[in-house]
Amino acid sequence: MRIIDSIPHESMTISIFQMNDKYQVRFEAGPMEQTFKFTLEEVKSLENLKTKINAEFIEATRKRFNEMFVQMRDI
């Protein structure tokens, strides 16, 4: 697996990896991580993948991180 691109964001690290016939988009915020997997067949190209990872997708991921932080804090 190798990193092929990243998406700039002020509060998360967003990295795009490629391995065999899949892309993985990894979001990292503090001790939390979320990874989304896409096949090349689904997205066709890196450019198409990056259009799927739009502001709405990123915001939903950020909200999920907030839920994860609360859950971890309350353990």
What do the PLM-derived regions correspond to, one by one?
Residues M1-Q34:
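N-terminal acidic leader/helix
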Residues H9, L40-V43:
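A mid-sequence interfacial segment
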Residues E33-E41:
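Short amphipathic beta-strand/extended segments with alternating polar/hydrophobic composition
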Residues E42-I75:
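Mixed-charge, Lys/Arg-enriched low-complexity segments
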